[in-house]
């Protein structure tokens, strides 16, 4: 819940001096990316900008405090300020900020700018007290903000020092409007106006000018002069002389003498107690100070000129001027040290009563009251956890004694979930085991079950499916239906374990159940996870269309719940890329893989390994080995600089082994094979993939017998577990083994089975990457004219893809090939005396490649009637009457030229 006063522009008071000369300068702010107002405390930065902002509706205001160094808190308020300025235009960014569904501040800002691209009016965002920001991540994100903000947006920043926002670069590019302390200092005319409004008896212009000069136009000093003159009998000029040359760091003594010592004791205590509040309203003041009418007291303090300012138009929220507030807090620690814990405790209770647990925690920590802190956490910690207030929760839990956690085991569970969210898996089990040992009395079955659900999640994350299944089952046996979050976790883990075991049907049912529960209780990240798992299961079963439709549901969920910046989004676009690749939609597959890399742009480069492997895979399917090698260099560099799950390594190894196959690099394959551990099982599609990598390397090295043993066992497991996509892949690799071993009949048998299975999977690229060996076999099958219609159509499609992406010169009879052919001593006389045109040679090459007339016309981009004319002419020149004769003639020419066909 956001504090309204932090988003309210200060109210312009009647007695303030209108700074016309500075307002004139600020009137051109819309021509700059950044308007920067810098000066020490008390020069009127906030007052000036609030005067300038008056009447501007498309303006958001964000007043910072020290707590805004938390990235999530900073983001929430900044987006809320933009929403204030645009009347709620940026809904997606708002949801992402509220639910912490973004990878980084920069990526959140990128989404914001996408939405602001449709906002065409001038827009202003004011950030006050930026000097309070010390988090370098926020500085870097704001530099990103300034580089990429829309042209119609101006950022206005007030700070006591020069912020780390790339100021020099903006200045050089004339994109910076600056106002500093010299310009903010009051001139003689403004000082005269100021005193005329503050003092009951007017003073001469000359005296006003002298006082202004004595304090160098410092607004705070002028205000103190006026305050002293009203409270004391000595003249304003005496105060001016005392303040001459003083600065903010030496004000304390003056403020004690001239302010605190000149108010009654009740007012003094009111000021000191209320100063612990960063912002205050009637209820807070009443509870903290004990005075009955807090609002009236605040208005009285404001009338006395004691540096209090209204923070909203309704007059409900107030705050002290930062300079005076800091002074009062220091004095409070000295003068009311014994009472201070009680004051903070009262503040915490009041913030809780108004529904602001984060502010209440701040005061409970300051009070050192573990009981209060414990009670707040017991009631609100899980809500804060679900809103990703992780840093605040961690600080709070550290402040509680271990005994307090043991007395309230759900706080132990919360601490364990915090560790899990930070991937500190080993610490989770250590913490839970210690808690179970030391908790006094018997733990309830429900609490045990919650512990086990979390342990199950840790176990599956650590690659221990057996333990994960045991713990998930224990949790589900004991968890009441109402304990929905832990039930969602345990059900998801159980489904994932069954997926790993190859029990796809039961896994699918559990993942569908997880999705239903997660949607019902708005646990969106588990809903998304379950959809991704369902898609993977459908893919493994060979139901790629069902996988596609499930992915569409997941994309819709991401859009509706603004989950675009969760790392899981990368998982989804990656499996979409895998599916597109399988169907030979290579451009779309590549774009999807690149979007996955973009999702992970704020994470460590190692996280991009799988998407990078997919980019290599796209290059391999296109036959672009140069680009594949460039990408492989990046991939192998990542492999050498990180620790990865076995599934990730398997996917990376797959493209490496295929590349070695295509380039004939037996040395690399042999070296890899000697170092690669063999998986213990092959009962899921992850393990099948690594065994396939091993078999492919063995085939490349001519180790046909061990490769055949591997592939036959893989097929047996795949048939038993209904891993139909893996069976399809295994058959294609077995086909290559038989072909290279000279077992042509076996090769043809498994190829026909693979083509039949591809009617279900839709596979194209898996055939294409096998290159010319696959093309030769498909040509023969097409010539035999024995394939069923669907398989025949797929075989022709695969041939087109091979010819498009793996353009062997002999398949297309290009000019160089034809020239060498005509100069060959054994070329048939008929070819010499009646030479084919270049176009006719191209047509012959495409006929040999298995193209139909329509496909040849499409390839050469000419009319079908033109192709018929070319075919008739080349038949006549070759002395053949039928298509099969032309294919055989082309085959003889290729053999004569030394190509093994």
UniProtKB/Swiss-Prot annotation:
GO annotation terms (biological process): positive regulation of carbohydrate metabolic process; positive regulation of DNA-templated transcription
GO molecular function terms listed in the Swiss-Prot or TrEMBL record: ATP binding; DNA binding; DNA-binding transcription factor activity
Keywords from the UniProt entry: Activator, ATP-binding, Carbohydrate metabolism, DNA-binding, Nucleotide-binding, Transcription, Transcription regulation
UniProt xrefs under SMART domains: HTH_LUXR (SM00421)
Cleavable signal peptide: none
Boundaries of every HTH luxR-type domain copy: 829-894
Control of this protein's activity: Activated by ATP and maltotriose, which are both required for DNA binding.
DNA-binding interval(s): 853-872
Residues annotated for ATP binding in this entry: 39-46
NCBIfam families per UniProt: PRK04841.1
Family: Belongs to the MalT family.
Protein name according to UniProt: HTH-type transcriptional regulator MalT
Organism in which the protein naturally occurs: Escherichia fergusonii (strain ATCC 35469 / DSM 13698 / CCUG 18766 / IAM 14443 / JCM 21226 / LMG 7866 / NBRC 102419 / NCTC 12128 / CDC 0568-73)
High-level lineage: Bacteria, Pseudomonadati, Pseudomonadota, Gammaproteobacteria, Enterobacterales
Gene designation per UniProt: malT
């Amino acid at each position: 819940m956001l504090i309204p006063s932090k988003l309210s522009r200060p109210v312009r008071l009647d007695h303030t001096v209108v700074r016309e000369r500075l307002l004139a300068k600020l009137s051109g702010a819309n021509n700059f990316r950044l308007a920067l107002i810098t000066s020490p405390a008390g020069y009127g930065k906030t007052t000036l900008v609030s005067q300038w902002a008056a009447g501007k509706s498309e303006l958001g205001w964000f007043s910072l405090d020290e707590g805004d160094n938390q990235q999530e808190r900073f983001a929430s308020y900044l987006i809320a300020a933009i929403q204030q300025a645009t009347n709620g235009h940026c809904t997606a960014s708002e949801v992402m900020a509220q639910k912490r569904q973004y990878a980084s501040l920069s990526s959140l800002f990128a989404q914001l700018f996408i939405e602001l691209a449709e906002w065409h009016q001038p827009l202003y965002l004011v950030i006050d007290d930026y000097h309070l920001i010390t988090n370098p991540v926020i500085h870097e994100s704001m530099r990103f903000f300034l580089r990429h903000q829309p042209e119609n947006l101006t950022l206005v920043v007030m700070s006591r020092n020069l912020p780390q926002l790339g100021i020099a670069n903006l200045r050089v590019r004339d994109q910076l409007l600056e106002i500093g302390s010299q310009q903010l200092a009051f001139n003689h005319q403004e000082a005269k106006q100021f005193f005329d409004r503050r003092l009951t008896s007017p003073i001469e212009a000359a005296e006003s000018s002298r006082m202004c000069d004595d304090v160098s136009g410092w607004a705070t000093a002028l205000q103190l002069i006026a305050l002293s003159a009203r409270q004391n009998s000595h003249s304003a000029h005496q105060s001016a002389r005392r303040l001459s040359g003083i600065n903010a760091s030496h004000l304390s003594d003056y403020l004690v003498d001239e302010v605190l010592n000149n108010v009654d004791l009740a007012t003094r205590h009111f000021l000191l107690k209320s100063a612990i509040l960063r912002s205050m309203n009637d209820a807070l003041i009443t509870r903290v100070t004990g005075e009955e009418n807090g609002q009236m007291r605040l208005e009285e303090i404001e009338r006395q000129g004691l540096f209090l300012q209204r923070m909203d138009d309704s007059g409900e929220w107030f705050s002290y001027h930062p300079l005076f507030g800091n002074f009062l807090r220091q004095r409070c620690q000295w003068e009311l040290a014994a009472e201070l814990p009680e004051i903070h405790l009262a503040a915490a209770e009041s913030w809780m009563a108004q529904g602001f647990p984060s502010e209440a925690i701040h005061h409970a920590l300051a009070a050192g009251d573990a009981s209060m802190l414990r009670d707040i956490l017991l009631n609100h910690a899980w809500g804060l956890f679900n809103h990703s207030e992780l840093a605040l929760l961690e600080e709070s839990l550290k402040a509680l004694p271990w005994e307090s956690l043991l007395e309230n085991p759900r706080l132990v569970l919360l601490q364990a979930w915090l560790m899990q969210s930070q991937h500190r898996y080993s610490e989770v089990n250590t913490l839970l085991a210690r808690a179970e040992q030391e908790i006094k009395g018997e733990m309830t079955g429900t609490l045990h079950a919650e512990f086990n659900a979390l342990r199950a999640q840790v176990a599956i994350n650590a690659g221990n499916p057996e333990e994960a299944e045991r713990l998930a089952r224990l949790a589900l046996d004991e968890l009441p239906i109402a304990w929905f979050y832990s039930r969602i976790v345990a059900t998801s883990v159980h489904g994932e374990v069954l997926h790993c075991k190859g029990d796809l049907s039961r896994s699918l049912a559990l993942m569908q159940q997880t999705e239903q529960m997660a949607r019902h209780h708005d646990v969106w990240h588990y809903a998304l996870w379950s959809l991704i798992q369902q898609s993977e299961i459908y893919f493994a079963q060979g139901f790629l269309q069902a996988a596609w439709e499930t992915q569409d549901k997941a994309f819709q969920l991401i859009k509706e719940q603004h989950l675009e910046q969760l790392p899981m989004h990368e998982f989804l676009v990656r499996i979409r890329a895998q599916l597109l690749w399988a169907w030979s939609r290579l451009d779309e597959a590549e774009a999807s893989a690149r979007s996955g890399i973009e999702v992970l742009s704020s994470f460590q480069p190692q996280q991009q390994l799988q998407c990078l492997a997919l980019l290599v895979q796209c290059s391999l399917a296109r036959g672009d080995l140069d680009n594949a090698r460039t990408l492989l260099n990046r991939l192998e560099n990542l492999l050498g600089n990180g620790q990865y799950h076995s599934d990730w390594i398997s996917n990376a190894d797959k493209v490496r082994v295929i590349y070695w196959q295509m380039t004939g690099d037996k040395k690399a394959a042999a070296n890899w094979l000697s170092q690669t551990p063999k998986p213990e099982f092959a009962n899921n599609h992850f393990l099948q993939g690594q065994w396939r990598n091993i078999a492919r390397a063995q085939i490349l090295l001519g180790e046909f017998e061990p490769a055949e043993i591997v592939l036959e066992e893989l097929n047996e497991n795949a048939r038993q577990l209904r891993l139909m996509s893996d069976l399809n892949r295994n058959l294609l690799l077995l086909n290559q083994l038989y072909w290279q071993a000279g077992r042509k009949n076996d090769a043809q048998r498994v190829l026909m089975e693979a083509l039949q299975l591809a009617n279900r999977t839709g596979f194209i690229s898996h055939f294409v990457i096998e290159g010319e060996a696959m093309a030769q076999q498909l040509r023969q099958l097409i010539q035999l004219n024995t394939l069923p219609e669907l398989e025949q159509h797929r075989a022709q499609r695969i041939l087109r893809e091979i010819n498009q992406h793996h353009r062997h010169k002999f398949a297309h009879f290009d000019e160089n090939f034809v020239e060498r052919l005509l100069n060959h001593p054994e070329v048939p006389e008929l070819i010499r005396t009646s030479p084919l045109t270049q176009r006719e040679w191209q047509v012959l090459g495409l006929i040999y490649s298995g193209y139909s007339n329509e496909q040849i016309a499409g390839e050469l981009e000419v009319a079908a009637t033109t192709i018929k004319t070319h075919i008739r002419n080349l038949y006549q020149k070759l002395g053949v009457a039928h298509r099969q004769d032309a294919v055989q003639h082309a085959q003889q020419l290729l053999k004569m030229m030394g190509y093994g066909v």
